[in-house]
Amino acid sequence: MIPLRNAKRFFYKTLEQPGYAFRVFSRRLAASFYYNLGNGRSSYPEAITLFLTHRCNLRCQMCGQWGEGGITKKQSAQYIQEELSLNELTVLIDNVSSFKPNITLFGGEPLLFAGCVELIKYIKQKGMHCLMITNGSLLENLAGGIVESGLDELNVSLDAGQQLHDEIRGMPGIFERIIAGLEKINYFKEKGHKKKPLINLECTITKFNYQYLEQMLEVAKKEKANSLTFHNLIFLSRSIVDKQKEFDKLLNSSSLDWEGFVFEPGIDPKLLEEKRRAILSKKHDFSIDFYPNFSCAELKDYYENPCYLPSTQDHRCLSPWLVAYIFPDGEVRPCLNLSYSFGNVKEEPFLKIWNNSQARHFRAILKDNKIFPACVRCTELYRY
């Protein structure tokens, strides 16, 4: 439910947002009970992630959607442009408001969705926790509305200091735009005497920045971040993806999205561990963690053995009992990178979809197998 390796993260959440932490714990307790029943059913989900759009205005090199090997940029224009309307999304929020899931807004870049701020306001009016994951490039002009909306958490992706960040993100000047946006967020928070949104900086560890992670410490301090998380790189070998395709036949689905993560990490785990220890040895005004939170030996194996799973980690995935991913076309998926769908919110209410025959079938197969091949590099495996 709350893996020991995540205890520190959960502790800080409890201090900052005790109500949120209590709901998370109770939902995970219920999900664990249903998982052990083995009939494929689940209690209400802890969280729903809404992919508001496939569109993105950046081309970050490591991104599985729009990066060098990204899969989304190979899709048709019709696929990329398809989105749920604001009205369809508010109907969805009405449908799930009775059990108050945590809502995450994601993309693509969610702020490219024209009704994003209005949607946040509606989610908060319904009493739900709302978090947004953004590249931060559009924050400056929307900062006032975002703060006024009541957004709980703003997760902003940053890779390093100015020069290196812009190189990785593929757009000169983007770092300064993000910083200007964060400063506007802080300005409106101070003006309105508001504590929220909490600012969480998210740094993906890649071959481009792993030798310079300390640059993020000064950025986090200057921008008054509440937390700084360094995310270990998601990558797969070709052999794992090929094994995953065997399960595609069983599920009558596709793992095409995983193709965007087939590459060599190019990271020296020994040097990365040195950087990690140096960063964690100092005290800061914001929380810092590395996710997944590996030991030194685990970190080495993670980057050198694509099939590696720590012996201390439960070799089972609880995510489809706890999280629903709703894509821009309305499809409700149990996994980020599988095309398998429980149903479509354009056609029937979410609550009818969540425990329907397709959902129970998927969960039953997953429980029988504990994990699928590609799960070894999915961060959701380490979350629950």
Put a short name on every predicted segment:
Residues R5-E153:
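Conserved alpha-helical substructure of the radical SAM core
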Residues F10, A31-S32, G38-E46, W66, ...:
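Flexible mid-to-C-terminal extensions adjoining Fe-S/redox cofactors in radical SAM and related proteins
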Residues I80-N87, P172, E176, K207, ...:
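Conserved phosphate-coordination/catalytic loops
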Residues G67, G107, L158, N232, ...:
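Residues that line or immediately flank small-molecule/substrate-binding pockets and catalytic motifs
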Residues G115, L142, Q211-Y212, K282, ...:
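Residue-level recognition of alpha-helix termini/interfacial anchor residues
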